[in-house]
């Protein structure tokens, strides 16, 4: 375990799954989970970390099932994008209530609701200590919020994409189904592909690999895990170009 008192990263892109925001509710947003995440983000801001956030929309809407039932995929994806805006509004409000300056930017114009995404302005806001929430994915159908997280992370020149999930890292198998599944502390991009490990969709993962963007998978439901990741402590699974031996 590292005893480094200084943060390992200075600018991050935090990807939160929409499903994890449900907490025990089963649907929608659990206010307790939302407020806890806002407090954890506040801790990072107080450490001087520049934080960009992308939130999924699976707690409110999933277009895949409706697409299989006959709905046009583009329509379903547009609905999914709007679900991420709803989550973004909730997170911005939670941050404001925690006395954290935050700005919500959408990849699709929503005048009067949030700002349009602007790369240069986003970086300026991050440098000034504001949290920037990126909503509506990439603005294009057929692109996941994982792709949006990697894209925004690359654009804002983040040092790492932190992917918050419901498990505490990457395992050799599904730990929920296989108690013998082994957790990896660190992997290379090539090992992920060779072992066919599920981290994120291939388009998002390839984008991160091609731009040498590290990905760190951790359990967003574990209190204090986010801070531990930032401080370089043993938490989650780090994926990067080459393992350090």
From Swiss-Prot:
It comes from the Bacteria. It catalyses: UMP + ATP = UDP + ADP. UMP binds at residues 57, 77, 138-145. InterPro entries: AceGlu_kinase-like_sf (IPR036393), Asp/Glu/Uridylate_kinase (IPR001048), Uridylate_kinase (IPR011817), Uridylate_kinase_bac (IPR015963). Keywords: Allosteric enzyme, ATP-binding, Cytoplasm, Kinase, Nucleotide-binding, Pyrimidine biosynthesis, Transferase. HAMAP family: PyrH_B. This is Uridylate kinase. It comes from Shewanella putrefaciens (strain CN-32 / ATCC BAA-453). The lineage of its organism: Bacteria, Pseudomonadati, Pseudomonadota, Gammaproteobacteria, Alteromonadales.
């Amino acid at each position: 375990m590292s005893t480094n008192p200084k943060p390992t990263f200075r600018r991050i892109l935090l990807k939160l799954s929409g499903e994890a925001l449900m907490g025990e509710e089963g649907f929608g947003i659990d206010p307790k989970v939302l407020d806890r995440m806002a407090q954890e983000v506040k801790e990072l801001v107080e450490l001087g970390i520049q934080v960009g956030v992308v939130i999924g929309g699976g707690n409110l809407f999933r277009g895949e099932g409706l697409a299989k039932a006959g709905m046009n995929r583009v329509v379903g994806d547009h609905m999914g994008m709007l679900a991420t805006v709803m989550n973004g509004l909730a997170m911005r409000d939670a941050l404001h209530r925690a006395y954290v300056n935050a700005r919500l930017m959408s990849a699709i114009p929503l005048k009067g609701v949030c700002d349009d995404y602007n790369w240069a302005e986003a970086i300026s806001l991050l440098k000034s200590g504001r949290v920037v929430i990126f909503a509506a994915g990439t603005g294009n159908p057929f692109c996941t919020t994982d792709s949006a997280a990697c894209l925004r992370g690359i654009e804002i020149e983040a040092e790492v994409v932190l992917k918050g999930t419901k498990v505490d890292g990457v395992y050799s198998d599904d730990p929920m189904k296989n108690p013998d599944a082994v957790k990896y502390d660190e992997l290379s991009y090539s090992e992920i592909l060779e072992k066919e490990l599920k981290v994120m969709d291939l388009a998002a993962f390839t984008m991160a690999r091609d731009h040498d963007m590290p990905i760190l998978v951790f359990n967003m439901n574990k209190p204090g895990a986010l801070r531990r990741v930032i401080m370089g402590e043993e938490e989650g699974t780090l994926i990067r170009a080459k393992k350090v031996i």
